[in-house]
Amino acid sequence: MAAASPFFESLGLELELVEPPAAVAHPFDDGSAVLARRSLEETARSLGVDAGAYRRLLTPLVESWAGLRNDLLRPVVHWPRHPLALARFGVSAIRSAGPFATSRFETERARALFAGAAAHSFLPLEQPVSASFGLVLLLLAHVSGWPFPRGGSQVIADALAARLRSLGGEIETGRQVSSLAELPPSRLVLCDVAPRQLVALAGDELPARYRRRLARWRYGPGVFKADFALDGPIPWSAPEVAEAGTVHIGGSLAEIAASERDAWEGRHCERPFVLLAQQTLFDHARAPLGKHTAWTYCHVPHGSTFDMRDRIESQIERFAPGFRDRILGCSTRTAVDLEHENPNLIGGDISGGANTVGQLVARPALRPSPYSTPLPWLYLCSASTPPGGGVHGMCGHLAAKAALARG
């Protein structure tokens, strides 16, 4: 999402973004695949009888994106700058992704393409607002693509750190902070932490009512991550899948919906929806000559310690026979492992909290500014604030603006 972020755009960071020919590919058991390309028209034509429905759904959003993005990437409750465009988006976005895709499209190809994008919500596809994630991600495919930074995601952090230091900022790492009292005196403190961590850091300084609100914050399913070193590119049955930087592995809408429902309800799906990135196809410096990598994750129950590697491999092998033969090594992390590495990832939840209707509106509390706390000098700026998870920097950007406006 960095390519579409007003914040990153304003910084003018010296990043080289790599945009594959297709944002995402979705393979099927018959050896075919559907791809979302930058060209909306080309993508629509690939959907056959659903071409018209796809155009009608996405074209108005693409045409209004320049204004719409400023309304989408901010708190849900706000005075819209482009009310008509936002209303057009909202009518569809509020719906549940499964029934929405079924009512909009006739073919399994179009329904599955939408379901794969909507599954980024970490919600059952029967839940309200899950359609919003499908709309936004397919919209981004056509307005900015799904690019990634050449050299790896670390270059984004390095560029941001360099900009901060150029302005006189300092960064201290390798130090555990257990209380806000450990911080040096300052007029403002912005915490990029989960609500649970904020309560632990601030303690009784926060009013009891606000602490109780943060304690009720619900975290969503976790992820199981598997990173593969490969001795060659993934041998997809549908060769065109190699044109995409991201691959959604999950078959039909019904299968994806079952996977997301299982994770939400505490079960480990036998055929999980897998998100796979194959970036060495387009950024060769990430692997030795002739070798490749693939990073993957699937959704699992909150706090899971279950090893999903075999199920992930089976899902990839299903659409790329011979994949297992190309594995040189694999590094895995359970949901609990991820939380141990980063305490913000409560139970392995990488979204900062469940993306339910209530938690999108009150994220993490219903306040005039969701970034503010009852303490006038303390602000929250993590993915648990609007607009939520993603590499867009808008949570911190909007929190900083709110803090400065408050004085």
PLM segments and residue spans:
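N-terminal FAD cofactor-binding segment of flavoenzymes
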Residues: 1-23
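Rossmann-like flavin
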Residues: 29-128
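Helical element adjacent to the flavin cofactor pocket in flavoenzyme catalytic cores
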Residues: 133-181, 187
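Short beta-strand to alpha-helix junction loop
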Residues: 85-99, 140-162, 304-308
